[in-house]
Each structure stands twice: as C-alpha cells, then as structure tokens.
C-alpha cells in the first residue's frame, strides 16, 4: 500500500544487486545437477529440467588461449601470420565460388527469403543465438531452448544472489552512471546535479568514512534516548512515550516501525492527499521467516547479526544475546498478527477511512495523536481523516505493545533504524552484514564500493541522476517510437476487449474508456531539462562532500519531509513517482498512468536497429503488461480517474474471478524442486495476469504492423520466422538463475513469479506461440487446457 505504483515489471531490489560475469566461449561448465521445475497436481507432477547455475567456479579458457598466442616468439608469429593469410585467401575464394554458383542458379531456383545482412542485423542475430540451446525442444521447454546457453555461460557472482539479463542491463546502466557521477563539475551542472555528484564522492571517500567511523550513528541513537542494549543497566526510558519515539523515527529518519505511515492519494478520492496507515514490514523478507520451522537457521543468523552489531557498538555479548532473544520474540508476535500479503489483494476489503477520534476509540492501546503530531508540523485535530489498511493488525499490535516492557520495545525500535543504516557502514560492520546475508540470500561477499555508491545515489537523488543520464545517453527518438507502440498495443487491448464474451457490454465500454484514458510517461519528466525547477526538487536537502553518513541521514530527513509536505494538498497527477535511470516499468492505479523510464528503453527491450518483432516482443510486451495492470485483480478496482469504486457488475466480477482463479491454479502447480516449494499463485496473480495479457496484446499489435508494412527481412543464420523471434526475444528477457536462498526469498515475498515461470506460464497459454512454433496439442508448451483473462 505504501507505494503509489505497482511493484514494477521487475522488482527493483533484485535489479540493483546484480553484476555480470561471463565465461569465455568454448568453456566447459562444471557438472551440476539441474534446477528442476515441476508442473502438475501437488504431489504428482511432470518434470521440466532447467539448467541449474554452474556455481562460482570460473575457468577462463578463452583468456588462456589468447595469452599463449601473445607469448609466441617472432618466428612463430610469422608462421602463424602466414597460415592465417593462406586461410583467409582460401575462405575468400570459397565465398566467391559460392556466390558464382548461386548466381548461375538464380534462373532455376525459387526466390530466396529476404535476409538482412547489415551489421546491426548480424549483431542482433549473434546475440540471440549466443543465448539459445538449439538442442532443446521448444515445444517441451521453451525456457531451456531460449536461455540454456546464456544460463550455462553466466555464473552468479559471489556478491550477488542471482544473475539475469535484467540484471546485466542494470549493471551496464550502472557503469554509465558511474562515469557520469565521476565527471568533474562543469557549466551544465546545477544545484541538484552537484548534490548528486557530492553525495557519490562522499560515498567513495573511504579514508574519510573510516576517520569519522560510527559517530553519526551513535549521536543519532543518543538523540533517540539511547539504545538500551548498548547503554547497559544504567539505561532509563526517556521522558516521552513510545508513540513519540515512533513519530521521531518517522519524521526524522523516514523509518516505519510497528506500523507504516505515509501521505498519499486517497484510494476513493485520488485528487486528495491523506494520512495513511498500514501494518509494519518485518525486518526479514517475509513473515514466514519468523513463523516457519524450516527458517530457523535464517532466524538464528538474524539474531547473531543484531547481537554482533550491538557488540561492535559496545554492548556486553551475553547481555545482548539475552535482550535480543526478547526482541526476536516480540517480532515473532508482530509477524504472527500481521496479515499475509496474499490475503491483501482486495484493496476495497482492507480499506477503512475514519477520523483520528474514531481510530483512537477503536484502537485505544496506542496514543495516536501523540504519534502523528510528533512528525506533522501543523496542528492535528480529532477530525483529521485517515485511511487505514490493517485495522485487525493495529488492534493486536496495540495489545502486544501494552504488555511488552519499555526496554525491549526501545531495543527493537532502535534496532530497526540501525539495521537500515548498516548497508552504508564499512569494515567490521560490513563484515557482519556479509555473514548474515550469506545465510539469508547466499551472497558471499559485498559488492564493489562504486556499484553500491551508484545505486544509493540513484535511489536517493534519482531525479538529479536522471537529469545527468538523459543529457547524452537517451535517444529521444525512442520516446516517439514508444508512444506509437503504446497506441497500437492499446488498440490491440481494445480489440481483445471487444472479443471477450465474459464481460457485459456496459462494463466493457467503461473498461475501454479507462484504457483510452491511461496517461503514458516515457523516458523522464520534462522538468529535468529545467535547471531552476530541478534545483527546487532538492532545495531542502543539504549535502556535503566529506560526511557520507551525515548525508545518508540528511536524505532520510528529506524523504520524510518531501512526503509529509503533501498533506492536505491536492495530488499532482503529473508528478513522476520513479527515477528515470532504472530498468523497470510501472502502473499507478491512483493516477491511471503507465510509466516507462529511460533506463528500460534499451536492448533487449528496445533498439532502433531491432526488427519490429523484437521490439514488440521486448518493450511491447512490457507496455501491454503495464496496461493490463489496470485490469488485474487490484487495478480493476479503480476507475479511469484512479478512484476505487465498483464499476463492474456482479456477474462480470464473478466471471473475472473464475478466469483469475484459473491463473492462480495454473501457477500454483509450478514447483521449484531445489527449494521444494510451489509458486504462490495467489500472491503472484496480478503479475501473472499482466504477463499473459501483455504478451497477447503485443503480438496482436505486431501482426497488425506487419499487415500494414509487410514482413521484415529475416535475421541471418537464425532460421526463425519473425513470429518465432517475437516469442524468443520475450523469453530471453528472463534468462537467468538464482541461488536456492534467493529462490526461497522470492517465492515467499515477491509478487513476481521467478523468471523461468514467466516464460513457461504465458507461452503455454498462448495459441499464437503454439502456432508460431507448430507445437502439437497436448505438448508441454501447448496444453489442451489454457488460462485466459485478457
């Protein structure tokens, strides 16, 4: 509920944690057992074998060969050059003979297919072929067919939990941002871009960070009344309530503990900003880590992590162990009373609008006025309207707080702030975090410092970084192309809408109106090109070159201020809610807009040199995916103006739910054998519906383009039609693999299905795919029973 948009085409936190390491051509892959995805009724399933990641062992056979050539003596080099010259001459003669032979036969042969032989086409064909496993049967396992070689040649780096084409693109983007942020200040810079460069520079200044140490963190904890576990037996509760402490964390450090709070559009009145409350996000990736016996090792690692950090700050180890046992018990209780995410998809069912007086009456265990007034500058009255999304949780949480001693509460509340700061710490603190993440995510080491600093700068000053990025790294023609593709894909959606027989005519007409009313945001907001307006964005943010941790704390205060200042102001529906330099896309239900940042308008998704089949199979499917989000299990609850209301009649709602349940059941039968877990089809249904709808709409739009412009020349050496290339490029977006620990985390906490499932699920539902690859009915990729919503 906290974000104004859906979770994006791909969860961002996965992207920014990645890097690419590729094995040389011809390299042997360490023998491993394959990662298996099974599909079928639970307990009895057919098995689809997917290539398991070969691990972190790297052999560089290609490099070895090159080195041996460079070490040859002069005589050997001359001999080698002679052999190469003869070989080249023979090859040229062979090609000339072939050309002559083909020319002589032109009068008797049928016309050959039109093949594109430009440099761009050759490069594109080579890229597609280099990822494929041509020995795999496309109608049995299209993921292996499309991605088998890519997965075999790309190892998961030690500092990553997964590797994928998405993540490789994000890493390429990071390299560009690194170069931009390291450029000296120049005449084109403004106050905002200078702050971004200063933040990055302070992040890279390790000697200065080491000199300052953890002093800013210690001062912060002291300001908040002291961390009891570190202060020791002499700690006394501060002369203010727990609610005031929670309010200070929210207002000063943008940290939500025990509950989440933000200011945003009212779901039932999207033009008005309102105070909103929701249940807390637990410290570990999902509530399951606290409640399932199978996660005891991760929970123990979490306890060890918090203990080690407290000891580094001066706590007695034995005391810390005992006190954090009580903290873990508290967080277990909070996790237990929280509502599972897959039970929160019906926004209208959990939405509750009430006044502060009503909230206080229904949840009397908490002093709500004290909490809110601590971080809201203007007076709060008992009539202040509030939207709450977790009333049952608040009731239970209030009771837990009442029966928990102040020392344990303060230990937990301040630990959550400390934990959020830990990624920015170095040396011993960093090492303890690495040890924890090794157990939780399988990550064996920390990333390069520059990569971390680029990520943090882009996250914390995203618009300033975006302004730097678009100067020289964004092809403005791609914006016009994307707009045209959005138009054609929206037309395809409306055609499919007209053809479906489960909606009544009135609802269908309203749905078409909503689709046509969607606003599209492509590339970046226009104000990034206006230095004065851009500088206003960060006028309240103070950044210095040589105080990194102080800068981090300043950004947290700025983020809190930036959000809270919207209270009682009308919603700016033209304002972007994401930074431009990110490989992702979004749909915002309260604004009914689709957002495609500059970072995603690059290969594999889009290139001006790609044939249309690849662009429609790439960014086209992304466009269709985001359009479909307006009509998935959550988006369908909002009208064209972004207001939550019932604009479907009951018969149509029932028909939708039946089709959505088909998707839920289908995806719930996919099982990742390596972690022995099924996909949560209920939690991932919105993204799965969008994947299926986006694929169908984009292919229809592509075929309409072909009917107008004709077939494009084929790509050389691939031996695939453009219909086949459309689906191949879609699948190769999802090439990748992940560690078992990461697979477990994603299944438990992510609204997105893992990459292989995002290939196998939509394609096995697609009649267009089955025709393109001539898959027999009943084959794994062309089952007789298919699911279809949009």
Language-model regions: role of each:
Residues 1-54:
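Intrinsically disordered, low-complexity cytosolic terminal tails
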Residues 48-90, 301:
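Helix-loop boundary elements of multi-pass alpha-helical membrane proteins
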Residues 81-172:
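Signal-peptide-cleavage-adjacent N-terminal segments of secreted and extracellular proteins
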Residues 131-153, 288-312, 502-505, 685, ...:
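Hydrophobic/aromatic-rich, well-ordered segments within soluble, folded domains that form packed cores
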Residues 145, 278, 597-599:
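Active-site-proximal beta-strand/loop segments in catalytic clefts of secreted hydrolases
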Residues 159-181, 317-337, 615-621, 723-727:
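Short secondary-structure subsegments characteristic of cysteine-rich extracellular domains
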Residues 170, 327, 333, 353-369, ...:
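Intrinsically disordered, low-complexity linker/terminal regions across diverse proteins
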Residues 176-488, 525-527, 537, 542-559:
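Noncatalytic, helix-rich "gating/capping" subdomain that lines the substrate-entry/channel surface
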């Amino acid at each position: 509920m906290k974000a104004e948009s859906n979770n994006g085409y791909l969860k961002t936190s996965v992207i920014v944690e990645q890097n690419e390491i590729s094995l040389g051509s011809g390299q042997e892959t360490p023998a491993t057992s394959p990662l298996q995805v099974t599909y079928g009724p639970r307990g009895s399933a057919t098995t689809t074998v997917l290539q398991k990641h070969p691990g972190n062992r790297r052999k560089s056979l290609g490099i070895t060969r090159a080195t041996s050539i460079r070490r040859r003596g002069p005589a050997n080099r001359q001999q080698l050059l002679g052999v190469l010259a003869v070989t080249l001459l023979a090859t040229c003669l062979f090609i000339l003979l072939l050309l002559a032979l083909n020319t002589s036969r032109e009068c008797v042969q049928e016309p050959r297919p039109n093949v594109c032989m430009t440099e761009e086409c050759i490069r594109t064909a080579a890229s597609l072929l280099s990822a494929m496993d041509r020995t795999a049967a496309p109608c049995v396992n299209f993921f292996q067919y499309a991605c088998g070689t890519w997965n075999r040649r790309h190892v998961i780096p030690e500092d990553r939990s997964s590797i994928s084409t998405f993540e490789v693109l994000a890493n390429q983007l990071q390299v560009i941002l690194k170069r931009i942020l390291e450029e000296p200040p120049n005449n084109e810079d403004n106050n905002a871009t200078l702050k971004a460069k200063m933040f990055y520079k302070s992040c890279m200044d390790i000697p200065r960070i080491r000199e300052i140490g953890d002093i800013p963190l210690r001062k912060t904890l002291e300001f908040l009344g002291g961390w009891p576990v570190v202060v020791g037996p002499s700690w006394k509760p501060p002369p203010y309530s727990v609610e005031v402490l929670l309010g200070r964390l929210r207002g000063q450090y943008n940290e939500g503990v025990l509950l989440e709070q933000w200011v945003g559009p009212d779901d039932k009145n999207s033009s008005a900003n309102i105070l909103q409350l929701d249940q807390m996000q637990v410290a570990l990736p999902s509530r399951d880590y606290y409640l399932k016996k199978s996660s005891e090792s991760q929970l123990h690692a979490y306890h060890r992590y918090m203990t080690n950090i407290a000891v580094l700050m001066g706590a007695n180890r034995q005391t810390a162990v005992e006190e954090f046992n009580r903290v873990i018990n508290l967080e277990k209780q909070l996790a237990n009373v929280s509502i599972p995410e897959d039970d929160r998809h019906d926004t209208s069912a959990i939405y509750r609008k009430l006044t502060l007086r009503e909230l206080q009456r229904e949840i009397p265990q908490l002093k709500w006025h004290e909490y809110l007034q601590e971080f809201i500058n203007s007076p709060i009255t008992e009539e202040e309207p509030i939207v709450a999304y977790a009333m049952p949780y608040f009731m239970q949480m209030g009771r837990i707080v009442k029966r928990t001693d102040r020392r344990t509460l303060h230990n937990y509340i301040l630990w959550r702030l400390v934990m959020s700061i830990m990624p920015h710490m170095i040396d011993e603190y960093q090492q303890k975090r690495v040890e924890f993440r090794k157990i939780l995510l399988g990550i064996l080491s920390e990333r390069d410092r520059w990569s971390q600093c680029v990520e943090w700068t882009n996250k914390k000053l995203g618009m300033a970084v975006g302004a730097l990025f678009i100067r020289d790294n964004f092809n403005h023609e791609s914006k016009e192309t994307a707009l045209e593709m959005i138009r054609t894909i929206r037309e395809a959606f409306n055609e499919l809408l007209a053809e479906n027989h489960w909606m009544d005519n009135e609802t269908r007409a309203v749905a078409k109106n909503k689709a046509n009313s969607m606003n599209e945001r492509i590339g970046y907001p226009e104000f990034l090109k206006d230095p004065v307006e851009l500088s206003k964005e960060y006028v309240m943010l103070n950044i210095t070159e040589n105080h990194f941790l102080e800068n981090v704390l300043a950004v947290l205060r700025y983020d809190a201020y930036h959000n809270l200042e919207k209270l009682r102001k009308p919603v700016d529906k033209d304002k972007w809610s994401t930074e431009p330099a990110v490989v992702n896309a979004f749909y915002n239900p309260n604004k009914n807009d689709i957002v495609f940042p500059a970072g995603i308008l690059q290969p594999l998704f889009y290139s001006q040199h790609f044939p249309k089949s690849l662009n429609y199979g790439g960014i086209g499917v992304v466009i269709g995916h985001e359009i479909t989000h307006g009509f998935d299990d959550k988006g369908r609850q909002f009208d064209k103006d972004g207001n939550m209301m019932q604009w479907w009649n009951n018969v149509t709602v029932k028909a939708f739910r039946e089709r959505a349940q088909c998707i839920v059941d289908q995806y719930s039968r996919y099982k990742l054998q390596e972690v022995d877990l099924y996909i949560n089809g209920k939690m991932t249904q919105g993204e799965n519906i969008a994947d299926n709808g986006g694929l169908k709409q984009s292919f229809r739009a592509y075929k309409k383009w072909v009917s107008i412009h004709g077939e494009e020349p084929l790509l050389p050496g691939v031996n695939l039609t453009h219909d086949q290339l459309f689906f191949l490029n879609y699948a190769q977006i999802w090439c990748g693999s992940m560690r078992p620990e990461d697979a477990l985390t994603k299944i438990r906490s992510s609204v997105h299905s893992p990459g292989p499932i995002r290939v196998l699920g939509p394609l096995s539902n697609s009649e267009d795919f089955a025709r393109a690859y001539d898959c027999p009915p009943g084959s794994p990729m062309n089952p007789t029973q298919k699911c279809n919503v949009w």
